[in-house]
């Protein structure tokens, strides 16, 4: 096992951090409200949260939806939300086995869809919404197995 000169091997396991390839960290101005909103509207399950010992406020939480995990944390006081900026700099995509069912649940909460449920040219069935602070979320399901060159992309590897 490689350790690259550190005291900890790279393949170390940590039950507090899932083994996803990427663990997105999403900042919210009102973190407790955001956690409740993500649970209610998207179906996330809160795994744990932790408190800032100086303020006594929730500082971060790990949330899970299907096989995806995120860390939600409190933003800095002077940080703007995507909603305040009028745009989001990135999106988060979560994959489902049944995106239709998730789409029906999300629509039933009254959220405005940014992108209606549709099949993409690259073989995904997906839709998109913005959360309460303007972060862009895409919910997707593999609908077809397509090679990138089948829909016009140039394979470069």
Stretches found by the model and what they are:
Residues 28-32:
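Short acidic-aromatic low-complexity motifs
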Residues 2-25, 35-36, 42-97, 103-130, ...:
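Vicinal oxygen chelate
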Residues 133:
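C-terminal catalytic core of tyrosine-transesterase DNA break-rejoin enzymes
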């Amino acid at each position: 096992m490689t350790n690259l000169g550190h005291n900890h091997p790279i393949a170390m396991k940590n039950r507090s951090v899932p083994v996803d390839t990427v663990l997105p960290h999403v900042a919210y101005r009102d973190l407790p409200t955001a956690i409740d909103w993500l649970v209610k509207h998207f179906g996330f399950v809160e795994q744990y949260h932790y408190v800032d010992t100086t303020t006594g406020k929730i500082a971060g939480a790990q949330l899970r939806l299907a096989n995806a995990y995120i860390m939600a944390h409190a933003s800095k006081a002077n940080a703007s939300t995507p909603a305040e900026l009028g745009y989001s700099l990135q999106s988060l995509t979560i994959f489902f086995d049944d995106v239709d069912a998730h789409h029906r649940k999300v629509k039933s909460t009254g959220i405005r869809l940014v992108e209606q449920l549709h099949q993409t040219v690259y073989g995904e069935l997906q839709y998109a919404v913005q959360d309460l602070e303007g972060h862009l979320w895409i919910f997707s399901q593999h609908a077809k197995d397509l090679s990138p060159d089948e829909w016009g992309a140039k394979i470069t590897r």
